[in-house]
């Protein structure tokens, strides 16, 4: 830990003050504003927490029945707090600093977490000097000096709210997660919000899987207005067929998820066109003239968007910048701590009077008086927890720095987020955008049939706030930007139009779009689940747990997520019920507002009581009883079986979630009538909605034994290519009399007692992993035989007498002589390198560590937008990772070396940069002499302080 910032004594005998914040960056900034009378140091986040593992539980509590929870559920839910191992030196240092000051200022963030950090600091440091709570929502000199001059008391209601959530999440996770370990797979987790978020994503995938597409047609007409008005602008435009003989032509909105017309449609007034009908109508209209039946023009206005709050910033950064929620919040945190924007965790869209004035002044200077709204705009919304209702996210200060003014001070990501916040804030005080819409109804005849075409246009007459900011639409969900224009000629009723071209246009309805991070945040917010400050961590958690992976920007659930969600829905329905979870959030907010007693609430939730609605967890006997009663009734095979559909013979097809991954299964009747399972491995890149009956049949038809390539002419053994647990490989099939001791693709066999016998007891088939340049579907017998020759003997070193071999390893091709390995530059070298060439390589001095020759990259990508350097995918000690030569970022679950995009690689690098350098084990702190502290009243909770 670095030395404190500031002097240990004030000027002219003024009080010496210690200010504690969460981060070193924040400490540096505050130290510059507060001056030498203040010592500013950081706690680096929370210093205490519940035990993470059983090993963290102090010895005297290990025998307690509640020890595994870290919460004494029998004593008013007292939490067992321990100082986390990595923070012990920090606590020692802070205690030493506290001995030389007259006042302690706790300047952590003003939300639940910040208030809790401040409370834990008080309980751990046990200060004997006056303690003041210093709160600010932006890090500017004016805000910091004002906060120091007007401190407040610690808000215990807010501390209670944080502690209750922490205890609740611990009880939920530690009681429900073991059910998943026993019934689904080890290392899974359940959570109050993460399980509901997973259910939302799974349900959307279910909807996609059940979706039946409907096909419908219409006609697009290209029309010429010059026959009536040679000066019309534009002269040509397009219109779409909307009615035939008084019947409205069906559009995608008229069809339901099953591919039929929706129940609320008046079927007698709708016509569904097919290819033939549309083509016939188009043929009948060729060369005809159409008439404008009506032209309706209307004025419209569009109001600016409110300034950002946490959730809308995450959504817009996701849509506009393609940033993940985690990446957005990490960047916003840096901007806040360095004094560029206000606090980034807020539910409020309100601006202070000075911020409104700053935005209006800047809009006036940059765009002109006419672009500023006539009066100040204030955006108010109902905030669940008034005590956490900070100002909206905006540029810091009483005057805003323009993006141009700070572009040289910020990195690329920081600049993009700052510009986004600045534009949104300034635009919020600008004038409405104004424009006109024009709707044309055009009629004609196709033989005996009366047809109606429609065209709609939009023209922006005054951009207003759109000069500064245009909100981005979610591409997966469709939509149109606010500044998009569609110009039509100004026509009047009765004018004639020539038909230039007619195109029958076929359409198919699309399944509901998968959630992106942005749309998931919006859904969680609309449902009232979680709070904006937690959304980024929730989305990260469901990906880290393997429940969800990204495909482009879409969130795709895994089959494990299906199994877990199904189990929770069937046996713990209230825990993943949207309304119940939202109601629980409101109740927790009531604790923060001082309207609910936390101990009583937790007691009802865990042990049961008369709290909540008729079927609440409390009235059902509480969480503990719910888990205890239900766990024995859970059929593991049932919850791990996801029925997809019936095949053509009425046989159910299931996805089974097994210990080594998901697989397909159905039962087939043998000649004797006995049912035997037919199974097929699932490709990890196949998404659930892509697993159709046709695809399933193809997988079932793929031989489990692999693709036969041919016969080795030397041994007569059959050579097959397989896809194994550790990737694709080739192997030889030994004759039955040679294969008494093990399966070719296992190398071991099970004994009667279930133990695996060594493959060395019998012949072992030759195997070889495919090279990176090879594909399982196209590899030839010739390629396979070359692989089976590896490791290839190159020759014998005449000097040492040691054999030199060429081999293929995890890190690429290499030479091996005894214990001395040297990398090869290409895979082809393994098959063609000569002894002389190998000896030349060994004659060169061996370079160790980072100076050694690196294996070739797994894949080359484009340029990183932040560093401007090329990105490579490499294979490292802990698996594949992306690098630009400066920053390394491991690929996460769901990221595939072959399919990863430049955009995703850049996102991983940006996330890694945002987390800062890798933390090395801290050096042992020097001992700081401290006076013996007076015995204080015991802290709430079971606290374990360092000796």
Curated annotation (Swiss-Prot):
Entries under SMART domains matching the protein: TOP1Ac (SM00437), TOP1Bc (SM00436), TOPRIM (SM00493)
Entry cofactors: Mg(2+)
Active-site residues annotated for this sequence: 343 (o-(5'-phospho-dna)-tyrosine intermediate)
Chain positions covered by the region annotation Disordered: 733-771, 846-888, 910-947
GO terms of biological process kind: DNA topological change
Site, as annotated: Interaction with DNA: 46, 165-166, 169, 174, 181, 345, 545
Compositional bias of kind Basic residues: 915-934
Annotated EC: 5.6.2.1
Protein family membership: Belongs to the type IA topoisomerase family.
Protein's UniProt name: DNA topoisomerase 1
Protein's organism: Mycobacterium leprae (strain TN)
Name of the encoding gene: topA
